[in-house]
Amino acid sequence: MTPLRRPRRSRLLALCVTAMAALPLVSASGTGVSAAAPAVTRAPSPSDGDGPEVLRDRTVPLALDDFRTLCTGVPFGAPREWTFDFFDNARLTAVEDGIDDDGGTRTWSGHVKGRPDTSVIVSLRGVCSTGGTQPEGTVVEVVADLGEHVYHLETLPGRPLRARITEEDPAKQPHHAPDELAVSPSARTAPRHSLAGRAAATSQNPAVIDVIAGYTPLAVQRAGSAQQVVNTIHWAERKMNEALADSGVPASIDIIGTYNTGYTGNNTSSVMWSKLSNPNDYELGSTAADLRRRYGVDLITVVNSVPGQSSGQGSLPVRGNFDDSLAFSVVDYDSLTGWYNLGHEIGHNLGLFHDRRTLSQQVPDGSWVNDLNTPYGTGWITSDEEHTSLMAYASSCRQPCRTENVYSDPGLSIYGQPLGNESNDNARLARLTTPIVAGYRALTVARTRYALTLESSEGGSVRPAVYGPYKPGTVVAVTATPASGHRLAAWIYDGRQYGPTEQVNVTMDAAHTLRAVFIEA
């Protein structure tokens, strides 16, 4: 059984920020690379004062220039490091795992040095632009999730620029009601189609699901600006791709564009999903249908704002019947970072169901069993009631528990607790369904993507932090894992030999080949 490379714990509270002033929150590492203090601004919370999850806070000046080293190129080799000082007794060094560039947003991903089960995210918009003036809509997003505690920074309104830093206990965040099972009555009586014999996604042929993401004016109001919403959407994109990779699913989503829906009606997720799914609905559905037709994307998701309600809704194929009309999801803005909800709602588009306890509460007569796409396509709550998979609900735990950013898989464990069994294995199902959903439509616009061919000799294996093919400029971390009695001897990158380090980072400026060479220890 494989322990999680990064068990994503509970709520990764990513926050958007509008700018920074002079706080060297991040200092240079031994690599000679320096970075800056993160500053984040989230939606000015309407009246939400601090909840019980906030343990302490402080306000500091911020400086934008310190972040610009994150805009520099990344050479092949061992990952770079940055040190963050959140409080006098809270300093951490983060190891670089990847960089994604999406329509002007650069998202830096990493983990705490020596703690691959943690996550540190820095997202930049407008910071890497050249010139002496600060562009409008500059956004920085930063979060450090150590599991039991989460640190984040949030910019405050006004000038000079200042930021609020908080330490939070995610276990004290309030639970939200499960989303409804978005299944039509006719689908429940349709003939069953077996997925047996379907070609699964593989590391040699990973699936890419193309997505366009919309958002509502209420989401913009909640976030503070449209740029902050877009920033957080790309943060959530990275998190879902990590969830797929960490669950052994060779697939990814690619959000090729975003748009403001202009929708000012009821933001309740079930209402919006019904409208979004209807191509004749003039408020949401007709625009979504037109975007799919024009761009050839597989899925449409829309970010709304419904504090205190069900945090999303996603089209759910049932009984093995996948159809490109089942291509829509609605996700609450706060839930994107609160509990990885983009991966949950799009997980429904992949045919993945909740955990069995939640399903039994939602459908007490047990008829949900007949809707499953495979007998094992359900989420998981660990036997110690402390962790759930991405499709399960913490509200169904019998004690406070954390949602991990992975799909149920009996081959994964956290703190010795299996994250699935043979009857609850959403990752296995996703390996079958991601190629189906990726084949709903074919892109009608040019989209350059580069392949990274990974190889290894006998005696070990390699895997990327997220699967490709990759957009130009993406930085991908690749990790080597020796088998028992073996060790890593060298990396061969595009025909050149490099020394052995457990992790190397590759910049996808072209197609590349990387091979790990293992020898007996």
Put a short name on every predicted segment.
Residues 1-8:
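N-terminal secretory signal peptides that target proteins for export/translocation
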Residues 13-15, 20, 25-147, 278-280:
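N-terminal prosegments of processed precursors
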Residues 39-43, 51-54, 164-320:
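Fold-level signature of zinc-dependent metallopeptidase catalytic domains
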Residues 258-275, 323-408:
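The catalytic-center signature of Zn2+-dependent metalloproteases
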Residues 410-449, 514-519:
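A recurrent domain-boundary module in secreted/ectodomain proteins
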Residues 449-454, 502-521:
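Conserved "repeat-terminator" motif of extracellular CCP/Sushi domains
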Residues 453-468, 497:
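Short, solvent-exposed loop/edge segments of extracellular or virion-exposed proteins
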Residues 474-502:
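Surface-exposed interfaces of beta-sheet-rich extracellular modules
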